[in-house]
Amino acid sequence: MGQELSQHERYVEQLKQALKTRGVKVKYADLLKFFDFVKDTCPWFPQEGTIDIKRWRRVGDCFQDYYNTFGPEKVPVTAFSYWNLIKELIDKKEVNPQVMAAVAQTEEILKSNSQTDLTKTSQNPDLDLISLDSDDEGAKSSSLQDKGLSSTKKPKRFPVLLTAQTSKDPEDPNPSEVDWDGLEDEAAKYHNPDWPPFLTRPPPYNKATPSAPTVMAVVNPKEELKEKIAQLEEQIKLEELHQALISKLQKLKTGNETVTHPDTAGGLSRTPHWPGQHIPKGKCCASREKEEQIPKDIFPVTETVDGQGQAWRHHNGFDFAVIKELKTAASQYGATAPYTLAIVESVADNWLTPTDWNTLVRAVLSGGDHLLWKSEFFENCRDTAKRNQQAGNGWDFDMLTGSGNYSSTDAQMQYDPGLFAQIQAAATKAWRKLPVKGDPGASLTGVKQGPDEPFADFVHRLITTAGRIFGSAEAGVDYVKQLAYENANPACQAAIRPYRKKTDLTGYIRLCSDIGPSYQQGLAMAAAFSGQTVKDFLNNKNKEKGGCCFKCGKKGHFAKNCHEHAHNNAEPKVPGLCPRCKRGKHWANECKSKTDNQGNPIPPHQGNRVEGPAPGPETSLWGSQLCSSQQKQPISKLTRATPGSAGLDLCSTSHTVLTPEMGPQALSTGIYGPLPPNTFGLILGRSSITMKGLQVYPGVIDNDYTGEIKIMAKAVNNIVTVSQGNRIAQLILLPLIETDNKVQQPYRGQGSFGSSDIYWVQPITCQKPSLTLWLDDKMFTGLIDTGADVTIIKLEDWPPNWPITDTLTNLRGIGQSNNPKQSSKYLTWRDKENNSGLIKPFVIPNLPVNLWGRDLLSQMKIMMCSPNDIVTAQMLAQGYSPGKGLGKKENGILHPIPNQGQSNKKGFGNF
């Protein structure tokens, strides 16, 4: 016994030195107590004679079972810490010679002890697990019987085996055929509450007269160990082959697919657990099948258990959907926003290695934030490593950061769950210390309501964005309410404005519930025809027309027309120079002159003659005189914007709304020729008008032109409103150079816009002029009927699922239709050139053909002219092909345009 203790003490001393080389100091007495505890809880361990990671993990499982059964007061405080330290030594025994020597000597001691335990069962009955009598003990059987084995000897650890030894059953099993692992599991069932209860009780003890135990042959320990070693080597080969196939299959997979282990192959998935949570490896397969199965592609590190109960860990890639969502949240709301932190915490709940954390942060954050996170993470790991060193668990800085000997992913995969928890705490703590960049509310102020977006959907987007920034929508409810009004479209703002301070966000939604696309369309048309923007139209809609007099406070007149205090004026105003004739000092409404001081005729007075002082020279809002007047004004009445302006300002005399579908339109200016002598005019558009979407076409005004100067303008993209008096063009006067060229016409006169030479020709043939259009993507063919006011569709061609309603209108033509039906909604028409518009046709039964009326033809801008024979001959001479028209893609212009123009031309054209 002394020799056994000396070997045991020598092994403990070498183990102490091996731990000291790794920087861990332990007490010799504590190690002795620890191995005594190992013998008590794991009596099978000395008999194995081998120390490897698999058996040492079984020792850890026994510790956990013992802890769960008898409580923490029966377990030494340092038991689990020493178990972790020795586990690390076993993992690193190949790289440390001293550790290899300590492990080898321990195995030798265990093998020798296992032989002595088999032969010395009577000397140490407390440590005897199973009594095996050898041939040498045959002579002692009678003495054993005399001692009264059943009454004097202490009971064995396994009563079932003791009963089997003392029974007189002639069919006792051969000790060499005993399943030692099965007996171990059976013994564990007596104190493991996780195992299912026994259905039958063990056989009772035989209380008859003790008899001599059956003499059995002693099992050769070497042969048994060789047999177990061969089995283990075969199992290792199979496991290596199994892992190689799994690795090869994972490489063949693409995307997030991972290898699944079906139950038929013996592979059961085990999900990661929280630190401190432990599942004994001796549980039956039925209990494992009840565990929640989680897809493996969610966790970078997963663990599977094969049919033999062996646990294997695998490393999978991140789910790219999670990375994309985290990247979007960090970029849009900030790295420390509540929504971003919630995603980080959900990812951190899994087993992430230090390499996984570094990869995730580098992919999601910017370069500077990644360096900040890394510095904070390393600092947190240093603090954690110091606490681990004080606790003596051996989890150092290299393990926490994945550096040094733990830089590979394979080494990091073998970390304990507790170490994964420490890495998670350090990483998330570093993430929370990232600085806040920019304005967190910038993304919230950028949420604006679209023109056709329902107000409820807009508020939902606001609340969702606010919840991701502030953590909850209630935290920023006042801010959201303010933005719900300021970022709403003009229609919703007008509906909310009277009740803005009287209701909450729910009231806003109720007020704007009826505002839809149709309301927006009608509002835009009303604002366009009133010459205002939608916002100005809504602001001025509820204002009372007419103001109050600033003198008397009464409504109905202004201060300049107030007669309330007219008698208080001590000195009457003296009229100045007459703005009409510029010849004398009198009021303009009292002027009787027919011509001005330059001899130009003065137009007569218009409108009511109101007594009072003269209003002075008539000017427009922009400074141009007489731009809004309906009178005929000469060129001399035009003004320049500044002394350095090159052109004279031209204004519109009426309020006009232009749309892109209308094409070029001639706008009146009220200015008439002729131009000053020896000059001609060039009309150009203003830059500010071009920026607003109104295109002004250039034009030339001849010196002898006496008609009205008009402006050719077109709306480019959107609806453009030209208010009365707005400066939209300028007239530039240039010197006229006279040459000896032949003159076709002695005097231009008032011939102005309009063409008498170019026509859209519809040949009149025996065939009816038909046209094919698409109404809501359904094709219809009808006649072009310029005599029909409205478009009419046959009831037989009308789709039955399109709604129609009765009308109170009577259609008259060749026949008569009383109360015809009409489409309940506007239909979108489209031609072959993708021109489109809206139409609401009538539907009449028994109509022979569909009729395209003027309501549709006017939108298509169709012009039908009737040229005379002379014009037709001229067009044919220029290469016109009947039914095809002019152009190089049709028949082409065969000859250049001649220089001889028409002598009595009016407007455009050269034929």
UniProtKB/Swiss-Prot annotation:
Start-end of Polar residues biased regions: 113-125, 140-152
Q: What is its EC number?
A: 3.6.1.23, 3.4.23.-
Motif PPXY motif positions after renumbering to this chain: 202-205
GO molecular function terms here? aspartic-type endopeptidase activity; DNA binding; dUTP diphosphatase activity; structural constituent of virion; zinc ion binding
Q: Which residues form a coiled coil?
A: 216-257
The GO cellular component terms are: viral nucleocapsid
Q: Which domain of life is it from?
A: Viruses
> Which residue ranges make up the pro-region?
101-161
Domain G-patch: start-end pairs: 867-911
Catalytic reactions on record: dUTP + H2O = dUMP + diphosphate + H(+)
Indicate the segments forming the Peptidase A2 domain, all copies. Answer: 780-856
- Chain positions of all zinc fingers (CCHC-type): 547-564, 576-593
Tell me which CDD domains the record gives: HIV_retropepsin_like (cd05482), trimeric_dUTPase (cd07557)
Chain positions covered by the region annotation Disordered? 113-178, 260-279, 592-626
Q: Where is this site: Cleavage?
A: M100, A101, L161, L162, M216, A217, F299, P300, M525, A526, Y759, W760, A873, Q874
- Which example biological process does GO assign this protein? viral translational frameshifting
Q: What is the effect of changing A873R?
A: 30% loss of infectivity
**Phenotypic consequence of G885A:** 70% loss of infectivity and 60% loss of RT activity
What keywords appear on the UniProt entry? Aspartyl protease, Capsid protein, Coiled coil, DNA-binding, Hydrolase, Lipoprotein, Magnesium, Metal-binding, Myristate, Nucleotide metabolism, Protease, Repeat, Viral matrix protein, Viral nucleoprotein, Virion, Zinc, Zinc-finger
Please give the function described in this protein's UniProt entry: Nucleocapsid protein p14: Nucleocapsid protein.
Q: What is the protein's name according to its record? A: Gag-Pro polyprotein
Look up and give the organism this protein is from.
Mason-Pfizer monkey virus
